[in-house]
């Protein structure tokens, strides 16, 4: 915080100092996943709205508790991802609603890379409970699919971990080891309320692949949706 304050000429304050500041109405919560609920809850108790990084909480029960508290306090809580509101997500939705590919019946999404330890300065939390490929990045894909297809009815999945230890190759901690405490590969399928079925592959155990990020198959055509980590991108339709 001190380094950022010096670089951008802003104040570095503790969490308590920020929460006690009456001029601040909205908290942007960019802490690690394990701290999300605590910061959101403290923000609400101090009369402040909160927009948080994903995931909203460590589990479903905590998420419901946050929703209940926000409603009781009459405050707003938002959470990433919001990329589905961008041009690509909204254009894809418009095309589906206009029946350009017919009813969506099948699909795939693939999130495949070799993790975060090669670029992030402090990547440990990515491999702890509350993170991993689904909670950290997969939620962008799932949110986009809910935007395009609707609610999920059920899920089937298996998970695994390729290695129990990762080596940091980014600076300033090059060579340090990370203990892996959450699955780094998850594979499965989503069944939506409209009976569409989407197969998924989320992993940080793959060096390279040539899969599209999201492909949707309708009764009258197919659609390739661009990477939902971004707000824009090229949509491809084939018939």
List each language-model region with its residue ranges.
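NAD(P)-binding Rossmann-fold cofactor-contacting core
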Residues: 1-5
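Short, structured coil segments at secondary-structure junctions
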Residues: 7-8, 46, 148
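Short, Asp-centered acidic motifs that coordinate Mg2+ and/or phosphate
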Residues: 10, 25-26, 106
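Short acidic low-complexity segments
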Residues: 10-22
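Short glycine-/small-residue-rich Rossmann-like dinucleotide-binding loops
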Residues: 23, 31-32, 202
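Beta-strand-loop-alpha-helix segment that lines the small-molecule cofactor/substrate pocket
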Residues: 26, 32-33, 37-84, 99
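Predominantly a Rossmann-like dinucleotide-binding segment in NAD(P)-dependent oxidoreductases
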Residues: 83-179
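Contiguous beta-strand/loop segments that form the cofactor/metal-binding neighborhood of enzyme cores
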Residues: 143-234
